[in-house]
């Protein structure tokens, strides 16, 4: 086989493999599961960017959305307006809408980059910088963004791998609310 044909064959094979990898990547990510759903949420605690102490255990009685992100992650940047919109609707100002506390945990970022990111993109919720220890490990975070919806009793109701969409978060919250209501009525 002449060298030009061999090179073309190698390039073609490499491209075919890349297409297969990227074509199936999203499907694999969507099927990722976690042992945490239904379990008590692992610890999320630390000093936030604004210097206050935040601990998920202090949020018992409230819904919490724990979001793992990075300021350099494109899907994290793309999901951020969705998180902002969700947080604004669920800020507790409307008694007809369930309150959900959002907390973000930065993944491998500097505090200055995180502050700049939130300054540019909005979001008034607590943010734990990357130096908070083993939080991502305890939650089993594989890649950012990942988000977890936690019930008022402190149990993980759902995991979202990849960027969130507000409507999907609303659906997860509604299913969680229905499950909690079912638990209360014994059904």
Predicted regions, residues:
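Short active-site neighborhood of thiol/selenol oxidoreductases, capturing the structured segment around
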Residues: 54-77, 83
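Short loop/turn microsegments at loop-to-beta-strand junctions
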Residues: 41-42, 64, 144-145
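Structural microenvironment flanking redox-active thiols in thiol-disulfide oxidoreductases
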Residues: 77-121, 131-138
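N-terminal targeting signals for export/organelle localization
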Residues: 1-43, 185-187
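Thiol/disulfide oxidoreductase modules built on the thioredoxin-like
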Residues: 116-124, 130-187
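Hydrophobic beta-strand core positions in alpha/beta domains
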Residues: 65-67, 104, 149
């Amino acid at each position: 086989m002449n060298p030009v044909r061999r090179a073309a064959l190698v390039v073609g094979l490499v491209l075919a493999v890349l297409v297969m990898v990227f074509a199936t990547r999203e499907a694999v990510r969507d099927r990722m599961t976690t042992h945490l759903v239904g379990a008590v949420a692992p610890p999320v605690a630390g000093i936030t960017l604004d210097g206050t102490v935040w601990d998920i255990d202090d949020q018992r009685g409230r819904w919490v959305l724990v979001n793992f992100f990075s300021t350099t992650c494109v899907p994290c940047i793309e999901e951020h307006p969705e998180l902002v919109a969700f947080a604004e609707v669920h800020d507790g100002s409307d008694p007809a809408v369930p309150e959900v506390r959002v907390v973000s945990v930065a993944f491998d970022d500097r505090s200055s980059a995180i502050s700049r990111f939130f300054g540019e993109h909005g979001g008034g919720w607590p943010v734990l910088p990357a130096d908070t220890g083993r939080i991502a490990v305890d939650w089993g975070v594989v890649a950012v963004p990942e988000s977890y919806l936690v019930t008022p009793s402190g149990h993980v109701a759902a995991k979202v791998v990849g960027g969130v969409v507000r409507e999907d978060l609303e659906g997860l919250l509604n299913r969680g609310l229905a499950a909690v209501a079912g638990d209360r009525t014994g059904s």
